[in-house]
Amino acid sequence: MYIIFALLAFSALILVHELGHFIVAKLNGIYVEEFAIGMGPKLFGVKVGETEYNLRILPFGGFVKMLGEEDESDDSRSLNAKTPIQRILVMGAGAFMNYVLALIIFIGLAMSSGFAENKVASVVPNSPAQEIGIEQGDEFLKIDGNKIHTTDDFRMGLALAKGNPVELEIKRGNDVLTKTVQPILNESGMYQVGISYALVEKPTLLQGIKQGFNETRSLVSQSFIALKTIVTGEANLKTDVGGPVTIIKMSGQAAKAGANTLLWFMAFLSVQLAVFNLLPFPALDGGRIFIELIQMIIRKEIPAKYIEAVNTVGFMLLMGLMVLVTIKDIIFPIL
């Protein structure tokens, strides 16, 4: 049952993403031939007006098929007949909608359940924090030069330091202090300094909106940091990288933990989906935007057949990567 909730939640993220492409395409007068949720063989579909809406067998992915997207067309309503700016807006709309969804969820969670802020509520006796003079009410501003917007930013900073001392910028009253602390591992294998955070139990609307923006911004930053560790080889592919199987398992666990946890995980996945899709890789939205930018710079249209060839190769590589990561999930499961 929880897996069903998880799949429905993930499908909702895809729906929102593709809806972004669909809405902006329609607003720009583009003929949308097909709106699909999922990949692979079609389960069922219905045609409303000029567009066919269908659901496909694999619950990962989706697409909006627009006239002129895969080949050249002389029709004034085709994608290739529109300006580069219009095409970029269409391609970027999916990721934008995922950001908006994450923001709305985080604001809702902050307003309904409260949140922890970057202020110290208490200091554990004989902890690293006490040793360097951290006091109740201190507010963390930076860790190793990186701004702290949420408590997750602080935890990420400790994790990235890998046990090495970190430099903290702290606000105490009207003063800004700089202190260096040596993190220690707790029983869960996570680095800590021995503090608890102050809780905002009944935030105002302004506080909730601010926290929503901070949470979204923090996740975007963490996503790029994670990508960097994968590219540079710092990440352990066995334990730090998960694919479809891991996502389903984690979604199921989130659903089992309750509505708030599932909503938070949905927002988390929504940000990951947005960041991933904006990477400048062929077949992804970011790759298509990159091509449009190149065409704007050289002031010349690249023949559609070449663009389609590049996107086809990119899609095949992505599918191959998904298969490999799925196999990895089965052989070396994270959960």
Curated annotation (Swiss-Prot):
It is an enzyme of class 3 (hydrolase). Its cofactor is Zn(2+). Its main location: membrane. It comes from the Bacteria. One of its GO terms (molecular function) is metalloendopeptidase activity. Its EC number is 3.4.24.-. Keywords: Cell membrane, Hydrolase, Membrane, Metal-binding, Metalloprotease, Protease, Transmembrane, Transmembrane helix, Zinc. It is a multi-pass membrane protein. One of its GO terms (cellular component) is plasma membrane. This is Putative zinc metalloprotease CPE1693. It comes from Clostridium perfringens (strain 13 / Type A).
